[in-house]
Amino acid sequence: ASISNPVNRRNEMMTRMRGFEDYAEQQGHVGVFFTWTAPSRFHAWKTSGNGKTVDNDKYDGTTPRETCSYLAKLWSLTRAALKRNGTPVYGFRVCEPHHDGTPHWHMLLFMRPSDRNKVISTLQHYALHDDKAELERKPVAAPAFTDITPRFDWKMIDPTKGDATGYLAKYIAKNIDGAYVGDDEEANTPADQGALHACAWASWWGIRTFQQIGGAPVGVWRELRRISNAKKHGDLVGPPKPVLQDPRFEA
């Protein structure tokens, strides 16, 4: 079945995520959930002290697609650093919009327990790579930073409180069809309506909502499933046809 169908797409994402989690459990790896948010200058709106949304005077006109490219560049630097340090990770990334349409990233990554602190510090370093001064205390005091969570946040996945796939499930559904989510608290809308908005936003700006990190390419798995389904429904009859007109040329 085609992944252009939202239900099929959501089911495939959940299956792939479950496969990663099962592998992580077999290997004794741990999961960490990360959130990356772009600096203030990428946001057209901001929330004031009284909770109202107002114009952001720091906004430099960057589009959502350009912001996503910025985050992708940070991830490229992060991935290179992790590779240099011998700290491999694998998992999934979800890109979704803030209330003002600015993209932010959620990443669920698996790693060796011994690499966890190094991975966290590396992702934090690059998340705060630019415009770090906007997080500094004013007037200057100790500690130097009030809070880095507007730009970078992380949370350990605790298997006793729920599995990693279940934790990521709502982010997958929120950006496909909103199934089993209820209301989208961040957007303050029913989840199915919020999913329509998220899909339209991603389509308009040409943003890739989901990305697999590490692991085998999904294309082979999809093709094997297609062949399996074709056999099941009798669509494949007789021996497979050679790719070339004359098999002698294969040599």
Model-identified regions with their sequence ranges:
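Right-hand nucleic-acid polymerase module
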Residues: A1-G101, P113-A251
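Short hydrophobic/aromatic beta-strand micro-patches
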Residues: L108-F110
